Amino acid sequence: PKTLKDYFDQLDIAIIPQDKTQNPNEIHVKQSSTDADFGKLSTRLPIGKYTLVAIASKKSLEVTITSPTFASFSDEHISDMASVCQEIDVKSGANTVNAVLHRCFTRLVIQSIDKEEWNVDRMVITYKGKFSKSFNPTTGFGIADEQETSYTKNVSLGRPEELTPIKINFSTFIPEETVSLTVDVKLYSADETLVRSHFDDVKVQQGHVTTYTGPLFSAGSSLNFAFDNVSLVKSDYDVSFGD
């Protein structure tokens, strides 16, 4: 069976006393998947109740755990993560705690059904809406500002021997069960915009994947939306677009 290190590169752990008048000291530990004890922690704690917050993620991002209700990543696109927030009741003697981490972000996938064009050098995708790089480990929901956030992702397109369809992932935290985003996709050659696709009311769902599938490289394509009810692995808001 696969272990934590098969999915994630780092593990941030915080053990926070619930009564800081008796014990004000928090424990913060960062582990790497190259560590022999990755996914395990042995420590000494005074008797009492604590809140454990643990976040597994990719090494490309920094993670900060401030409290059981606030943690943040260094970027709005978090790639992949899983977390747990649970109470620990430390009694006298040896205590063993098992914690199961769960993914709690939302993911939007834009999948082309047509192949890359030779004269397209890069893609610029701009996402706008209520999403955040911060989340509440207790609830799993994002902590977003009242104003909408804008995030731009630049993708350089290679020159493979055989051009293929592409897939672009955007993973982030949302503050509610369902949030609507706007997405703007621009394809560039060396000196001009070739194709632009714009999507309004892109619904993403907490803990689910929403996939938009259609032609991105075909100039002049109209948008024809078809909603598809799918399993729990995906959200209920998959969309097909194109002619």
Which residues are covered by each model-predicted region?
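Intrinsically disordered, low-complexity repeat and linker tracts
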Residues: 218-243
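Tryptophan-paired
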Residues: 4-67, 120-208, 237-243
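Structured interaction patches on ligand/partner-binding surfaces of diverse proteins
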Residues: 32-34, 59-98, 191-220
